Amino acid sequence: MKTDYVELRQTLEERLAQLGTEIPGPMTGFARLHKKAMEDGALSRKVKEMMALAISIVVGCEGCIAYHVHDAVEAGATRPELLEAVGVGLLMGGGPGSIYTAHALDAIEQFLPEGN
């Protein structure tokens, strides 16, 4: 069965929000780290999100794929750019990473508007 990455991301958002109320220290600290690490600097947020997508493929994290495809699209990434990031994930992840490239393609097609 094909994963609904839009729904997966929404479910994770809800669960992470709950954790934010139950363990606010670690969750707030992580949120701050994420915000600072992903803001524009020498590298744009878009580039950083695509780097995170490639890493998500390597470590085999479907939830991470959902988050980083969504956020890369939000930052202006195009399908060709996202697919190049997927290729880097394949390079670095080898055989096991190849399975997650298919997951990434599904997520790209679900988050990216038609024709982009």
Give the residues covered by each predicted segment.
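Charge-rich, acidic-biased intrinsically disordered regions
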Residues: 76-84, 113-116
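Amphipathic alpha-helical segments within well-ordered protein domains
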Residues: 34-35, 52, 69-73, 87
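Short cysteine clusters
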Residues: 61-64
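Immediate flanking context of iron-sulfur cluster ligation sites
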Residues: 42-59, 80-85
